[in-house]
Swiss-Prot record:
First-level EC class: ligase
InterPro entries the record matches: SAICAR_synt/ADE2_N, SAICAR_synt_PurC, SAICAR_synth, SAICAR_synthetase, SAICAR_synthetase_CS
Pfam families the record matches: SAICAR_synt
Organism (species): Psychrobacter sp. (strain PRwf-1)
Entry GO MF terms: ATP binding; phosphoribosylaminoimidazolesuccinocarboxamide synthase activity
Designated name of the protein: Phosphoribosylaminoimidazole-succinocarboxamide synthase
Keywords: ATP-binding, Ligase, Nucleotide-binding, Purine biosynthesis
Amino acid sequence: MQLQKQDLLYKGKAKSVYETENSDYLILHFRDDTSAFNGERIEQLGRKGQVNNRFNAFIMQKLAEAGIETHFEKQLSDDEVLVKRLEMIPVECVVRNFAAGSLVRRLGLEEGQPLTPPTYELFFKDDALGDPMVNESLSVSLGWATPEQLAKMKELTFKVNDVLKELFDAGGLMLVDFKLEFGVFQDRIVLGDEFSPDGCRIWDKETKKKLDKDRFRQSLGDVIESYEEVAQRIGVPMN
């Protein structure tokens, strides 16, 4: 399928979305922009768009092999990918295998505390509101999703967790937590957006070194080098 990039549909914090001549498909452009704190801090980090695009393509293909439908169609270039056009559900699904980030702040937990079984949370995707936590009841009452869609999203999120925990563990890494976004394509719930170190927490199993966007949030340095290390350790082809 050879589709050409047309009008800019949407520019997010780190990706731009373009129309194609086929209304069922879009082109995502992964930019070098890196943001934190709901877009309050934005910087350019060289190679980031390429690294995240390749990382995401690898993960999406692994998930497809496990029977999880995603919007990924094919990688077009170093920083662009062809995807199905989804009707996005404005709710982020977050799984936590270990305590970190906002959960530590909210409940006073020790960072790195194992969570068994993993926790599952929903957040309304709205930067202006700070992506507040919501629940299934609110999501249904406000018309964001049906109970059946929410149940499928939860099922798929835990399936993703099972697949990726094993993948990262084999690379000597801890998948601490991650967020997913879903949409509807031809009446099916499909995984959308991206999976990269921008949207998850990944630590070295032995040293607990952070290898994700917390390096940017916490000004730890070596952000892209850490992304590339994770990619290398799980087998992402970077050339």
